[in-house]
Swiss-Prot record:
The keyword Aminoacyl-tRNA synthetase does not apply. This is HPr kinase/phosphorylase. Residues 198-207 are annotated as: Important for the catalytic mechanism of both phosphorylation and dephosphorylation. It comes from Clostridium botulinum (strain Alaska E43 / Type E3). The active site is at H136, K157, D175, R240. GO terms for molecular function: ATP binding; magnesium ion binding; phosphorelay sensor kinase activity; protein serine/threonine kinase activity; protein serine/threonine/tyrosine kinase activity. The gene is hprK. Catalyzes the ATP- as well as the pyrophosphate-dependent phosphorylation of a specific serine residue in HPr, a phosphocarrier protein of the phosphoenolpyruvate-dependent sugar phosphotransferase system (PTS). HprK/P also catalyzes the pyrophosphate-producing, inorganic phosphate-dependent dephosphorylation (phosphorolysis) of seryl-phosphorylated HPr (P-Ser-HPr). Homohexamer. Both phosphorylation and phosphorolysis are carried out by the same active site and suggest a common mechanism for both reactions. The Walker A ATP-binding motif also binds Pi and PPi. ATP binds at G151, E152, S153, G154, I155, G156, K157, S158. Residues 261-266 are annotated as: Important for the catalytic mechanism of dephosphorylation. Belongs to the HPrK/P family. It catalyses: [HPr protein]-L-serine + ATP = [HPr protein]-O-phospho-L-serine + ADP + H(+); [HPr protein]-O-phospho-L-serine + phosphate + H(+) = [HPr protein]-L-serine + diphosphate.
Amino acid sequence: MAVSVKRLINDFDLEVLVEGNEDVKIEVNDVNRPGLQLAGFYNYFAPERIQIIGKAEWSFLQDMQIEVRKKRVKKYLSFNITCLIISRGLDPHEEFIKEARKNNIWVLRSKSVTTKLISKITLYLADKLAPETRLHGVLVDVSGIGILITGESGIGKSETALELIKRGHRLITDDAVDIRESDGTLIGSSPKITIGMLEVRGIGIIDVTQLYGLSSVLEEKEIKLIMHFEHWKDDNDYDRLGIDNQYMDILGIPVKKLTVPVRPGRNIAVIIEAAAVNYRYSLMSKISPVDIIENRMSAVSDEA
């Protein structure tokens, strides 16, 4: 993943002082304040990072003798820098403009305070550069829990999502789920062209937002649980106690997975609601229902 400098300019309303190479891409989510570099120290310098000059760096340059400043700026901008942003609306020194034009480096300006600008850019890049993947399935928010419904085509994922929406829960995406990893969590969202849309066999595509209101759709949701649908098989030994701990790896993060056998007569929407509430209960409770039953059996045995 990469972010173009032009996109950064548009998203942060940056003023362009010097236009640089249009093919340059931002590929790391860190920034650098070049105080050490302007002092002549280049060990561990990362020119691929966005360079931000704030009041401290600007004042340091301002106090330099002109010839020294020219040499320092010339060396600094001789590196293959992605782009340079000057904060607080400060005026760049002439040496920066001259050397940036010579080396085809973007020089931008922001009115924001340096620390706030760094914080915003870091969070922005962490989001835009996060590892991504796309999975086939339906993502819904059930009782505040993000549940990814998977299974073969035609097994009833979208129909179940529709029933959940009717029961007051919310849709994030149907059919294609875009997933990105952010700080150890998985965030699911919808491709732009299918936001708020749900495909139901026999009816076609329905606009969930128009039929059920704006509150029935979410832009994104953290994925906490996977419900995998499969056709009921009589010879399968399905989990009946909730002790089978299955996980699915997505972008290196394990997500709890429950296999739900599907056959006529089973109310799958109600089962998913129960799974969501039970998942929340498991996070809050130190004892599982199986443990409670075992304790009761022990108590009965002791009484006998």
